[in-house]
Structure formats: C-alpha cells, structure tokens
Swiss-Prot record:
GO terms for biological process: endosome organization; endosome to lysosome transport. The keyword Zinc applies. This is Uncharacterized protein ZK632.12. Residues 35-131 form the PH domain. Keywords: Metal-binding, Zinc, Zinc-finger. It comes from Caenorhabditis elegans. A zinc finger (FYVE-type) spans 152-212. It comes from the Eukaryota. Zn(2+) 2 binds at residues 175, 178, 204, 207. Residues 213-266 are annotated as: Disordered. CDD domains: FYVE_PKHF (cd15717), PH_Phafin2-like (cd01218).
Length: 266
C-alpha cells in the first residue's frame, strides 16, 4: 500500500495539509518518496504532566506537535527519524494505560493511546515502517537511545541522595544519562553523551562516576553557581499549552493509510 501511495496525488494532498497545519514555523515535509502512513492524537508524558500531542507517522520520520486547534493548527513541531526509533511496551499502571515508550538517540518518552487496540495499531505501524526503512539498506539503526525522564511529580526527594526535598529553592533537575530527578548538589557535573548532545550535559554523580570509568580521558566540567548547564531542565512541551491534557477523544481516533499491516485482535 505504501509503495502505491508514493508520489500519488492523494498522498501529496495529505502531506501538504500537514505542512499547512504547522505553518511557516514547521519544516517542509513533502519530499520525494515520503508517504504519510497515519495520524492521530496521543497523550505524551511530558516533564510536568501528561499532555495531548498530534502525531504523524511517515515512512521515514515521526512528527509530533502541540495542538492549537484540533485538525487545523499545530505548533512546536518535532521530527524523529525512524532509523533511530525503537518502541517498547509499557504495562498498564493504575490510570496510566495503553502506553509504550518511543526511544530515540536524543530523546525518549512515554505515550498513551485511548484504547489497547489503538496502542497496538500505532506500535505495529511504527515497527513496520522502521523495519521497511532499514531493509532498504541506506539507513542504519541507532545503537544508543536516550533515557526516559522520570516525571517531576514522581519525585518529592532527590533520587540520588534521598535527602534533599524539592521546593521553590531546591529545584528539580534531570540526569541525562539515567533520567532520574536529582538535586543540584547531586548533579553539579557534566559529561558528553554523544547521542544526546554534542556538548557536555548534566549528569548525576553516580552516572558521572560510571561514565568516567567507561570513557577515560573526558574532562570534568564544573558549572559556576548561577550558570545554566547545556540542555538545562526546561521543556517546551510544558509551555504555551492551549488544549490541556487528558486522553484522546473519539474525535481524534488514529487514521492509518496503509492496508498491508495485520490489524491487532480486538
């Protein structure tokens, strides 16, 4: 089905519509050989809380953004190249159901669908697109993926020392190697993690020791008081929210345009 859609008029219209919804701030998505495979709303676990995001699956990239006006306007476009994407199932945990992890070299995060069927559809289509892309032979799979950040709300104390209570003075930080929420005293050093960022990024003391032992020769970086570290703990995902959070509605059920993937059993 995807091969038949390549450079078809209907596929071109779909991609042009996605570009129009992101406006001038989004990147050009209509390129030769690219196919829009599916689209829909997923709940992304952001640093502060879960929030709805619009996702578009192409045969070579996964695109998502903030919802400004449903099906009409999106912003803060993010593009993940599928050769670096890996999906991992998440077991249901209380109210957090129908979720999985999207792993990439630079950023990894959890997403949730409205139903188990939609979850399986998304995972099947993403895995199939990744497999097809790699089998074509001109892309290589990623060998390292970023850690999933522990949400702020799941840590009232530093997850390294277990003593520092977070408040307005004692801010939360995230280790870029393990994803834990840590205090400033337990994450004062930086280390270059090539798949995450070209410059040294904040890591906790435990990870700094293990990374230094595994990669001798890297110099320690001690930030001065008041200076911001590279990749500081800020997330545009938590800013300028328009539509609020919550699970996907029936109006935002995913639509997939390829018909050659076996549908999950209901």
């Amino acid at each position: 089905m995807v091969d038949r859609l390549v450079n078809s008029e209907v596929n071109s219209r779909r991609m042009a519509n996605v570009e129009q919804c992101f406006g001038k701030m989004g990147e050009q998505l209509s390129v030769f050989g690219r196919v829009l495979v599916g689209e829909g709303v997923l709940v992304k676990m952001c640093r502060k809380k879960p929030k709805q995001r619009q996702f578009f699956l192409f045969n070579d990239i996964l695109v998502y953004g903030n919802i400004v006006i449903s099906k009409k306007r999106y912003n803060k476009q993010r593009i993940l190249r599928l050769e670096g994407v890996q999906v991992e199932d998440l077991e249901d945990d209380g109210i957090e159901k129908h979720g999985w992890i999207i792993k990439t070299p630079a950023k990894s995060f959890a997403v949730y669908a409205a139903t188990e069927t939609e979850k399986r559809e998304w995972m099947l289509h993403i895995e199939r697109c990744v497999t097809d892309l790699l089998e074509r032979g001109n892309k290589q799979a990623a060998t390292a993926h970023a850690a999933v950040w522990v949400p702020d709300g799941e840590a009232v104390k530093c997850m390294v020392c277990g003593k520092t209570q977070f408040n307005l003075v004692q801010r939360r930080h995230h280790c870029r190697n393990c994803g834990r929420v840590v205090c400033g005293a337990c994450s004062s050093r930086t280390f270059r993690i090539d798949n995450v960022h070209k410059k040294p990024v904040r890591v906790c003391d435990h990870c700094f020791d293990s990374l230094s032992s595994a990669t001798p020769g890297q110099e320690e970086s001690e930030p001065k008081t008041g200076n911001r570290l590279h990749h500081e703990d800020s997330s545009s995902d938590s800013e300028d929210e328009v539509n609020g959070s919550g699970r996907s509605s029936n109006e935002s059920r995913p639509t997939f345009y390829r018909e050659d993937v076996q549908q999950p059993a209901t």
